[in-house]
């Protein structure tokens, strides 16, 4: 007989998530992350992203349950916790590769971060951002004027990217969305779909008069002058989903939401 998986339950600070964790650990035990087989994240999408950033290198599959305001990356939480082991056994994996971001700031400092949803550049003041865009070392747009621009993964393409009128990308398509944010010029440019191995480099053309910040998921860096983005070749995380509502189906369904 196969032993049940050891589960590490992580909860957001929200009261419903904390209460659910107490009930689940009483039922299934409370295992430390380093000795667990599976991570169960209780909260919303923000907490899921936080969990991936903090523990993604552990290579533990993550099964999320929605106890927050937004739960696109989560499964439904059910009051009957007795079926959790069956759900985990039936769960289907989704493999996500984050974006790697490298930044140079106006002060000369360097920084880096990962993003599972998107990397977005935004103007810091009322002045529009002026940016250039290079793809694999070739300048594709010499000057983009607008509020900003972003690069989104397939998993993140239904979030901020979609709100900015970017395309929804199928999971496993090995593509990225390059989407301008409120572009003024070029007027007719509405973004591009890139191969996942494309290196994207943004340069801020007037960083003193028109400062720009960059955010990788929730990690913001201000006063940037150059940002380079590529899909990570080393890091990959595994999310687990109920088969009747897996991530691929959710992304597909978003394209027909009315």
From Swiss-Prot:
Cofactor entry: a divalent metal cation
GO biological process, one term: NAD metabolic process
Species whose genome carries this gene: Xanthomonas axonopodis pv. citri (strain 306)
Binding site for NAD(+): 45-46, 117-118, 147, 155, 158-163, 182
Gene3D superfamilies recorded: Probable inorganic polyphosphate/atp-NAD kinase, domain 1, Probable inorganic polyphosphate/atp-NAD kinase, domain 2
Highest taxon listed in the record's lineage: Bacteria
Keyword Kinase carried by entry: yes
Family: Belongs to the NAD kinase family.
Pfam families, A to Z: NAD_kinase, NAD_kinase_C
One GO MF term attached to the UniProt entry: NAD binding
Principal location listed in the UniProt entry: cytoplasm
Function as written in the Swiss-Prot or TrEMBL entry: Involved in the regulation of the intracellular balance of NAD and NADP, and is a key enzyme in the biosynthesis of NADP. Catalyzes specifically the phosphorylation on 2'-hydroxyl of the adenosine moiety of NAD to yield NADP.
Compartmental location: Cytoplasm
Catalysed reaction equations from the record: NAD(+) + ATP = ADP + NADP(+) + H(+)
GO cellular component terms listed in the entry, alphabetical order: cytoplasm
SUPFAM superfamilies listed in its UniProt record: NAD kinase/diacylglycerol kinase-like (SSF111331)
UniProt keyword annotation of Zinc present: no
Signal peptide: none
Entry-linked InterPro entries: ATP-NAD_kinase_N, ATP-NAD_kinase_PpnK-typ_C, NAD/diacylglycerol_kinase_sf, NADK
Name of the protein described by the UniProt record: NAD kinase
Record's keyword terms, sorted: ATP-binding, Cytoplasm, Kinase, NAD, NADP, Nucleotide-binding, Transferase
E.C. designation(s): 2.7.1.23
Root EC class: transferase
Active site feature: 45
């Amino acid at each position: 007989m196969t032993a049940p998986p050891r589960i590490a339950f992580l909860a957001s600070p929200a009261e419903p998530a904390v209460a659910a964790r107490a009930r689940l650990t009483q039922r299934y035990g409370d295992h430390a992350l380093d000795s667990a087989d599976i991570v169960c994240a209780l909260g919303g999408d923000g907490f899921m992203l936080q969990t991936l950033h903090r523990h993604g290198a552990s290579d533990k599959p993550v099964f999320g349950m929605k106890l927050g305001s937004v739960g696109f990356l989560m499964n439904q939480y059910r009051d009957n916790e007795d079926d959790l082991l069956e759900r985990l056994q039936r769960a289907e994996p989704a493999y996500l590769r984050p974006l790697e971001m490298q930044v140079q700031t106006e002060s000369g400092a360097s920084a880096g971060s990962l993003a599972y949803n998107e990397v977005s550049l935004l103007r810091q003041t009322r002045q529009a951002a002026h940016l250039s865009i290079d793809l694999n070392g070739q300048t594709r747009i010499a000057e983009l004027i607008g509020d900003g621009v972003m690069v989104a993964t397939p998993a993140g393409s239904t979030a901020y990217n979609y709100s900015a009128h970017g395309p929804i990308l199928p999971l496993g398509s090995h593509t990225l969305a390059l989407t301008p944010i409120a572009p003024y010029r070029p007027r007719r440019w509405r973004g591009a779909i890139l191969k996942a191995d494309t290196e994207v480099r943004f340069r801020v053309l007037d960083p003193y008069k028109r400062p720009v910040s960059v955010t990788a998921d929730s990690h913001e860096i201000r006063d940037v002058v150059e940002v380079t983005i590529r899909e990570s070749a080393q890091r990959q995380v595994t999310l687990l989903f109920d088969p009747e509502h897996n991530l691929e189906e959710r992304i597909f369904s978003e394209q027909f939401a009315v």
